[in-house]
């Protein structure tokens, strides 16, 4: 979850909360979300784990490798007409019922963000389950909205106001995706220096 600061709470810890503590936790989160930027969803920070040479599921390592492959980066450059992209960071996300991401624009010039992406991995989704990727216009209206579609990627320039609507309490499945930013960075500043680190490298 996040607002003024990002707080990572292990899923096991959340599930172990007694009912009264869980209620207070949700009330605090919802108070933050009511008037500002806040989010609540499950995530695995793929890029951080790769760069720190931490253990990572083979499937997630493969996804990171694909996103940073010449084939994918060339695809992004061709699609956008932008020659700058040279690195993609990523996290795996799971939105359960009640999870959300309030309006923000992904502005972070110091991180070299050029485009945001959502690689949707939910096999079946109904629009009325929520979890829509909403783009917000200058009047605060939803100008466009996209439901998760299996194996589809949403790619858009940042900064740009957007949000993920709250997943409905009757949603029939979690909303699964890999998300992140296409960036232009000095690859020599990555841990270990040189090109994007090999996610399959074994930790000593």
For every predicted segment, state its role.
Residues 1-154, 159-204:
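Fe(II)/2-oxoglutarate oxygenase catalytic core
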